């Protein structure tokens, strides 16, 4: 073998270690992406959110570094690096703008969840409940099981009475708030079990948070401007 060449055994060993390292990283990433849901594991969900939040500044930093390294060396790479940096920065700014607009409507830190741009909100036993949803659904179902209230499958409260089911729920987006009015329910008061169904009734520039200080009827609590 000529001088300066790398032994084949050493190359194979490096490839084996590199492959093993990436195998661990990708396996962890697969578990986090598949089970990183708030209903399954709060810890994995937190890790998943941290990864998503880190990606924006990391990609922006890599794009700027590539632009610096390619300057006066490869103008094509330099142009693409600047383009990717601009796209990443624009997406990052749009995320914060929409998240802040959504927070103004809901006053919930779920507004900064990068997975969704819609939050379902309602008031249960005097407590505001806010849940991230993938989008504004056609209808919303609240389920009551022996006094335990489930909103879109999320357990949000216990000891709830049938009479305490809300008359409306809202789904807030960055640009609008959709009000869902209750159109039907089927409940068993003795066992505290049943369901209530809500459909869209109106939308507009409303706050999704009920105003506890105002003297308003249940049907008027939501429609006050942000």
UniProtKB/Swiss-Prot annotation:
Virion surface side: 1-11, 63-75
GO CC annotation terms, alphabetical: host cell Golgi membrane; membrane; viral envelope; virion membrane
Pfam families (UniProt xref): CoV_M
Localization, UniProt: Virion membrane; Host Golgi apparatus membrane
MF terms (GO), sorted A to Z: structural constituent of virion
Alphabetically ordered keywords of this record: Glycoprotein, Host Golgi apparatus, Host membrane, Membrane, Transmembrane, Transmembrane helix, Viral envelope protein, Viral matrix protein, Virion
Region (Interaction with N protein): 200-216
InterPro entries from the UniProt entry: ALPHA_CORONA_M, M_CoV
Residue ranges crossing the lipid bilayer per the database entry: 12-32, 42-62, 76-96
Superkingdom of the source species: Viruses
Protein's membrane topology: Multi-pass membrane protein
Assembly behavior: Homomultimer. Interacts with envelope E protein in the budding compartment of the host cell, which is located between endoplasmic reticulum and the Golgi complex. Forms a complex with HE and S proteins. Interacts with nucleocapsid N protein. This interaction probably participates in RNA packaging into the virus.
Family assignment from sequence similarity: Belongs to the alphacoronaviruses M protein family.
Function per UniProt: Component of the viral envelope that plays a central role in virus morphogenesis and assembly via its interactions with other viral proteins.
Protein name: Membrane protein
Species: Porcine epidemic diarrhea virus (strain Br1/87) (PEDV)
Gene: M
